[in-house]
Amino acid sequence: MQKAVVLDEQAIRRALTRIAHEIIERNKGIDDCVLIGIKTRGIYLAKRLAERIEQIEGKAVPVGELDITLYRDDLTVKTIDHEPLVKGTDVPFDVTNKKVILVDDVLFTGRTVRAAMDAVMDLGRPAQIQLAVLVDRGHRELPIRADFVGKNIPTSSSELIVVELTEVDQLDQVSIHEK
């Protein structure tokens, strides 16, 4: 059951614009920066960030797509023959010596980010890995912190954060739901 909308379309747009500026400022430009979105919604957020960065800097930043299914320690979705459902990684550039900015919709326990870092390290040796998330809801199980956060939304363990994006859900909003 939905309790409250915490970010609407305009608030999401503002948060992503701010994150884009923070990425540029922290990295003193975008040279050697690449964005890698974590499937599924992180990919669309990474593409939106890339558009904003290009508008601000006048240069394109490469964007990749990361499927972390095989790196997770809590596989849940399996195919009929009990194998993990893999959607595919598409990182069409070398990450070696790059500043990799992982992009995801929600930071919760940190397990997704840990799996994403493992997947990135299998692609090469980045100079640095940074993390950008639309929502940080707390409840970390691993010592992981986002470098760029759209909004901190403290939640209870009985609540869910639901991120809906136009590309997947036909609307942009973040809401809190009761489990």
UniProtKB/Swiss-Prot annotation:
Claim: Transcription regulation is one of the keywords in the record: yes
GO biological process, one term: DNA-templated transcription termination
Catalysed reaction, written as an equation: UMP + diphosphate = 5-phospho-alpha-D-ribose 1-diphosphate + uracil
Alphabetically ordered keywords of this record: Glycosyltransferase, RNA-binding, Transcription, Transcription regulation, Transcription termination, Transferase
Pfam families: Pribosyltran
Function (record text): Regulates transcriptional attenuation of the pyrimidine nucleotide (pyr) operon by binding in a uridine-dependent manner to specific sites on pyr mRNA. This disrupts an antiterminator hairpin in the RNA and favors formation of a downstream transcription terminator, leading to a reduced expression of downstream genes.
Subunit structure: Homodimer and homohexamer; in equilibrium.
EC number, as in UniProt: 2.4.2.9
InterPro entries in the cross-refs: PRibTrfase_dom (IPR000836), PRTase-like (IPR029057), PyrR (IPR023050), PyrR_bifunctional (IPR050137)
Name of protein: Bifunctional protein PyrR
Motif PRPP-binding in this chain: 100-112
Molecular functions per Gene Ontology: RNA binding; uracil phosphoribosyltransferase activity
Entry similarity comment: Belongs to the purine/pyrimidine phosphoribosyltransferase family. PyrR subfamily.
Name of the gene encoding the protein in the UniProt record: pyrR
Transmembrane segments: none
